[in-house]
Swiss-Prot record:
Role summary: Binds 23S rRNA and is also seen to make contacts with the A and possibly P site tRNAs.
One GO location term (cellular component): cytosolic large ribosomal subunit
Biased composition (Basic residues): 1-13
Species for this entry: Herminiimonas arsenicoxydans
Keyword Plastid assigned: no
Annotated protein name in UniProt: Large ribosomal subunit protein uL16
Amino acid sequence: MLQPARRKYRKEQKGRNTGISHSRGTAVSFGEFGLKAIGRGRITARQIEAARRAMTRHIKRGGRIWIRIFPDKPISNKPAEVRMGNGKGNPEYYVAEIQPGKMLYEMDGVDEALAREAFRLAAAKLPLLTTFVVRQVGQ
């Protein structure tokens, strides 16, 4: 699973996932087809991996997949049946915070029908709304 190799600080505050993805990471840059977020939310490292495996299994040997997001935010929680107080819990997993317009995955080397179906299978593993996009001429 994806997670940072090392961080300056182990724990991070919750923060608010606001705004939209303006220019960076919003276009199909590497492949021919892309899966773009139209909702907002958090995607865990496990969900990123589950979607990648679904796509990889569907396209079999053909094509290439790029993952355009990385889970770099630690989420901590306290163990079950532990009283409140006594500090913040330990980091349990990592998430990628996603704003609308962010490109999640890209694919190349397959025909459009196969890419659409692979992205449909991947989107079922993700907790936010997505759309299929094709690279525009001149990009």
